[in-house]
Amino acid sequence: MNIPMKNIIFPTLILSLLTFTALCRSDSLLVAVSSNFHTPMKLISEEFEKRTNYKIILSSGSTKKQFTQIVNGAPFNFFIAADTETIERLEKLKLPVRNSSFQYARGQLVVFSPREDIDVKQLLMASRDQKIAIANPSLSPYGKASKELLKNLKIWNSQKNNIVSGINIEQAYQFIKTGNVEIGIIAKSQLMRIKNQSEHSYWIPPQNLYSPINQSAVLLTDNEPSMLLQEFFHTNFVLNLIQEFGYGLPNDE
């Protein structure tokens, strides 16, 4: 799937505006956050701002694209990724604050259809031609896990030509939500945001069918607001919120 030029230019302009805003405010914290965690992070930011004198400015996108932006000098203060491997790659480049990374959540996959009262697993396993939306396995940790799930279900080879890849897990969900695709793989955190879940159909596959989606964060600047945000992630408020949005905690088996 070709990505229109506007999809490349527009996020770059947004990042430039966010960066300019953050640089103009000494009390601002520019945070790169994976698209799957954007909604809970907005709530975390609101509470953090109430408890401190610092303003959080969020930039949401795929983890791989944000990695590229950081390597190319984007002045983020804090990076909340959708995996652990990307953080480790940054650490090898000695870009983050030393020994500042931590795992904050464990993601889960859900096979989802907007249709009501259907066997989603059976629909996924069906041999007939059907479009299946997933996040891009090359860009998104959730996409990588989705591909692994389909492989372990022994249907990747038969269905790979029917895959519709979103840039990230949020776009994959939008493909399903708008009716362009009948079924897809989304994050459990997205399912938790859907009102009237009983009007839709979903299947939560066993986590032994794909590698754990361990999600980590890291400080990119050694300053007070970054350290305060790191500490805030370990509070009961944030830990409870993470679970409410369908994530597991780092010590969950």
Map each language-model feature to its residues.
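Bacterial N-terminal signal peptides
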Residues: 11-20
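Bacterial N-terminal signal peptides that target proteins for export
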Residues: 2-12
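A short beta-strand-loop structural module common to alpha/beta enzyme folds
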Residues: 55-64
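Short beta-strand
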Residues: 59, 101-102
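Short, P/G- and charge-enriched loop/turn segments at secondary-structure junctions
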Residues: 96-100
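Sec/Tat signal peptide C-region and signal peptidase I cleavage site
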Residues: 20-26
